[in-house]
Structures are given as structure tokens and as C-alpha cells.
Amino acid sequence: MTAGTVVITGGILATVILLCIIAVLCYCRLQYYCCKKGTDGEDAEEEEEEEEHGLSIHPRVPACNACSSHVLDGRGGLAPLTSESCSQPCGVASHCTTCSPYRTPFYIRTADMVPNGGGGERLSFAPTHYKEGGTPSLKLAAPQNYPVTWPSSGHEAFTNPRAISTDV
């Protein structure tokens, strides 16, 4: 390959990459404008005038949607799960129960909100096998084609009959 071929190939490759980036950005912008709810030409002009004058006739805080947090959690569809409506916007400190931001996977919980209290208390762990009690009665179906074999009986794995408490 000559130097000219390398330069031309590199230029074509850079152009293709830039065109792909521009196409993705245009697609994202198109999705943003197409999926924007409740805004048509007249509303957009009114909002631009309000922004210029610093006035707002209607509040910009979105209304509470009872199904939004359940959709983010993967627990629901687009229909509200409860019939009660939320009287407050979602951003206030005293949140409503139907659209609580505390249920979403994107909310970072502080130490006082964690069930363990932020690691201040000890959690106990009880082994599944006790010397005096034997194995617990779990009714599990064994695979029929592939039997499970263990290299040892497993009794030496759990020898402590007491609950084990560790720092979390």
C-alpha cells in the first residue's frame, strides 16, 4: 500500500464514522421531538414567548403519574395500578404512595433508609444443616436424566449448629 492509499482509506473511514455519529444524533433528536407529549405548534410558540418574558401561566411541574414508578420497576404496564390519584407533584418531600420515587431503581438510598440501618446492626445467618436436627426437609425434584453427584457427603461443610453472626 502506498501512502496515498492509506490517507484516502483513512479519510473514507473517518467520514463514515462521522456520518454514523451524525445519523445517531439526528435519530435521537427526532425521537425526542416525535415522542414529546402535548406540544404542538401553537403550544411551542406560547412556551417560547413565556420563556422570553420569564412568565409561566401553567406550572411546569409534571403531574403525578401513578404508573410511572411501577413501569420503571418492571412491575406494571401503562395502566395505573391503583385508582387513587396523586394530589402532589412527584418532586416534593412528602411523596405520594402511588408514584413514589423511592421505588425506582435509579433512586440512591441513604444509610437511614436501608433495612440494615446502614450496617450498624448485625445480621444472623443460620446454616441449613444441624448436627442434631439432620437435613431440613426440602422437597425438590431431582433431575431425571442427569443425576447430581457430590465428591463428599457434605456433612463436614456445615458443622456449626449455632447461627453465625458477621459484620455486614
UniProtKB/Swiss-Prot annotation:
One GO cellular component, as annotated: membrane
Spans through the membrane: 6-26
Pfam families, sorted: FAM163
Source species, domain of life: Eukaryota
Compartments in which it is found: Membrane
Record has Cell cycle as a keyword: no
InterPro entries reported for this sequence: FAM163, FAM163A
UniProt keywords, alphabetically: Membrane, Transmembrane, Transmembrane helix
Main location: membrane
Membrane topology: Single-pass membrane protein
Similarity comment: Belongs to the FAM163 family.
Protein name: Protein FAM163A
Native species: Mus musculus (Mouse)
